[in-house]
Curated annotation (Swiss-Prot):
InterPro entries: DXP_reductoisomerase (IPR003821), DXP_reductoisomerase_C (IPR013644), DXP_reductoisomerase_N (IPR013512), DXPR_C (IPR026877), DXPR_C_sf (IPR036169), NAD(P)-bd_dom_sf (IPR036291). Pathway: Isoprenoid biosynthesis; isopentenyl diphosphate biosynthesis via DXP pathway; isopentenyl diphosphate from 1-deoxy-D-xylulose 5-phosphate: step 1/6. It comes from Baumannia cicadellinicola subsp. Homalodisca coagulata. It catalyses: 2-C-methyl-D-erythritol 4-phosphate + NADP(+) = 1-deoxy-D-xylulose 5-phosphate + NADPH + H(+). Its cofactor is Mg(2+); Mn(2+). Pfam families: DXP_redisom_C, DXP_reductoisom, DXPR_C. 1-deoxy-D-xylulose 5-phosphate binds at residues 125, 151-152, 186, 209, 222, 227-228, 231. This is 1-deoxy-D-xylulose 5-phosphate reductoisomerase. The gene is dxr.
């Protein structure tokens, strides 16, 4: 039996995780749930899973939740505020944490879980993008275990040699016969949209992904392929890969979730229909496998599967991320922060879709490339990048 805290339980990954847990009650028990402010859904989750603890970042939402649970006659410990997630990520009574709070907001609670030596299922890619080697050092220093949940990194993890799985970020890929990691991406909803029409894309259009059901921020990142760029950076950290050891390919059907090329000419791949419950289940149950109710892959019905190179003119954010990864940690931290601000501004209709890349480029052009030596320095870089991003947005709005 594994005992869990779910960070971000009311989000897309959190709700999918709870679906998997509900199908395997003999293997997983929820001890704590954490969310920002969705007390309505949290009430239902408490009713279904009866955790011992709940954390709500928003204090008003915590009060509403407490009132709802009192009416239902359910007694649960409720804490609130910015430290709630950190406290519940380090509970003594749990061994596993699903880190699914989006953005850099999820960094501190994920670090709290690592420092408590927990098994961390990482769905928050921004933690690695922002902190890189410093983040991986926390994993090793505190004897924690890190398992990737992103479908691409989870796929890569599944088809890498076991020693690399056991010591993520430490071992040489080439020593174990790996010549290249191939990250796949659908290209999002605008893969065939005329380039001159991209500036008029609305936030609602950008949030409709052709294959995946996701939150609004990650849907926009998928449309710009910044999501793939962040995954490129994350893959370098997780798998100790050089820029020459990672390739990005467009794969519109999202059946091949990633591939690993070996020195003997073999290419191993993980295939499945697009469904986040599959990588979530693998991460939850690793190193074993447990059953879940998903549609099995039917090769006779797949039809044509295609691959292509990404177009840098269509996806400038992807190229920005690749270039930032070559510059170092200060650049990737800056890019991640700038992108979060830019995407939020786009969703609020303050800038155009094509301005997201412009904001990211403008902020990167201003950075001080001195590398951070601590998490605190990372957070300082993050704050400065956000300030510069807001200034860039004001400039574009003139």
């Amino acid at each position: 039996m594994k005992y869990l805290t779910i960070l971000g339980s009311t989000g897309s990954i959190g709700t999918s995780t709870l679906t998997v847990i509900k199908q395997n009650p003999d293997k997983f028990t929820v001890r704590a749930l954490v969310a920002k402010n969705n007390f309505t859904l949290m009430t239902k989750q408490c009713l279904d899973f009866r955790p011992s603890w709940v954390g709500m970042v928003d204090k008003r939402a915590a009060r509403e939740l407490k009132a709802n649970l009192a009416q239902l006659g359910i007694a649960i410990n409720i804490i609130s505020g910015n430290q709630a997630a950190c406290e519940l990520a380090a509970l003594k009574e749990i061994d596993t944490v699903m880190a699914a709070i989006a953005g850099v907001d999820g960094l501190l609670s994920t670090l709290s879980a690592l420092r408590a030596g927990k098994r961390v299922l990482l769905a928050n890619k921004e933690s690695l993008v922002s902190c890189g080697r410093l983040f991986m050092n926390e994993v090793h220093q505190h004897n924690a275990q890190l398992l990737p949940v992103d479908s691409e990194h989870n796929a890569i993890f599944q088809i890498l040699p076991e020693p690399i799985q056991r010591q993520l970020g430490c071992l040489s890929l080439s020593k174990y016969g790996v010549s290249q990691i191939i990250l796949t991406g659908s290209g999002g909803p605008f893969r065939q949209t005329p380039l001159d029409a991209l500036a008029t894309i609305t936030s609602d259009q950008a949030c409709i992904h052709p294959n995946w059901s996701m939150g609004r921020k990650i849907s926009v990142d998928s449309a710009t392929m910044m999501n793939k760029g962040l995954e490129y950076i994350e893959a370098r950290c997780l798998f100790n890969a050089s820029t020459d050891q990672i390739e990005v390919l467009l794969h519109p059907q999202s059946i091949f979730h990633s591939m690993v090329r070996y020195v003997d000419g073999s290419v191993l791949a993980q295939l499945a229909y697009p469904d986040m419950r599959i990588p979530i289940t693998y991460a939850l149950s690793y190193p074993t496998r447990v059953p879940i109710k998903v549609t099995p892959l039917n090769f006779l019905q797949l039809g044509t599967l295609s691959f292509d190179q990404p177009d840098n003119k269509r996806y400038p954010c992807l190229q920005l991320a690749i270039e930032a990864s070559k510059l170092g940690q200060a650049a990737t931290t800056t890019l991640n922060a700038a992108n979060e601000v830019a995407v939020a501004a786009f969703l609020q209709r303050k800038i155009r879709f094509t301005d997201i890349a412009s904001v990211n480029q403008m902020v990167l052009d201003k950075i001080n490339l001195e590398e951070p030596s601590s998490i605190e320095e990372v957070l300082c870089i993050d704050r400065q990048a956000r300030i510069n991003a807001h200034l860039s947005i004001r400039y574009l709005a003139l």
